[in-house]
From Swiss-Prot:
GO terms for molecular function: dihydrofolate reductase activity; NADP binding. The gene is hdrB. NADP(+) binds at residues 24, 30-36, 62-63, 84-85, 123-130. This is Dihydrofolate reductase HdrB. GO terms for biological process: dihydrofolate metabolic process; folic acid metabolic process; one-carbon metabolic process; tetrahydrofolate biosynthetic process. The lineage of its organism: Archaea, Methanobacteriati, Methanobacteriota, Stenosarchaea group, Halobacteria. It catalyses: (6S)-5,6,7,8-tetrahydrofolate + NADP(+) = 7,8-dihydrofolate + NADPH + H(+). It comes from the Archaea.
Length: 194
């Protein structure tokens, strides 16, 4: 992906907010080990920053805490929506919600305030699973090797997605997928991607 925002779809003249999952995924679907990424790819971190800056991001508490430990707070130049049942004291630029529906509403409000049409879902595994059925796109860093880990990206039916961009690198690829049909939540159906 060239760092450009994925295109949004229009309905009745209003831009619809799109949810796009962003993840670095090993060949065996591993995305984490002991609360951290089991690899260090500076190019992936730069790609993540280029992709998500200026947009709302949805994540779980553990993902937020991992980011906050490294950065000293929420991701800069993004509005973080944390999906958690815990009562957290969060700095400006981050808010906690207790349900997927509340996360969707908060992210849509933030996208409207920021003037963007795309919300990025950035982990962890449970949050990816909760949003996969409503995702319009996937922005993945696909590692060419398997890694040991305790956290995996959810299984997804590649037949429901079309690869729209690929940038092969040494040992990994940046790959963008678009859903072939509207996401289940957009159709009003309760279908999943399994």
């Amino acid at each position: 992906m060239s760092g450009e925002e994925l295109s949004g779809s229009e309905t009745e003249g209003d831009a619809a907010v799109r949810f796009v999952l962003v993840a670095a995924v090993a060949d065996n679907r591993v995305i984490g080990r002991d609360g951290t990424m089991p690899w260090h790819l500076p190019e992936d971190l730069k790609q993540f920053k280029r992709t998500t800056t200026g947009h709302p991001v949805v994540m779980g508490r553990k993902t937020y805490e991992s980011i906050a430990r490294q950065l000293g707070g929420p991701l800069p130049e993004r509005h973080s929506v944390l999906l958690t049942t815990r009562d957290l004291d969060l700095p400006e630029g981050a808010e906690a919600v207790e349900s997927v529906e509340s996360a969707v509403a908060a992210a849509e409000d933030a996208a409207d305030e920021m003037g963007v049409e795309t919300v990025y879902v950035v982990g962890g595994a449970t949050v990816y699973e909760q949003f996969l059925g409503r995702a319009a796109g996937l922005v993945l860093t696909e590692l060419d090797a398997a890694h040991e880990g305790d956290t995996r990206f959810p299984e997804w039916d590649r037949g429901k997605w079309v690869e729209t961009d690929r940038d092969d690198r040494d040992g990994f690829s940046f790959v963008t997928y678009e859903r072939k049909q509207p996401a289940a939540a957009d159709r009003g159906a309760e279908e999943s991607d399994e």
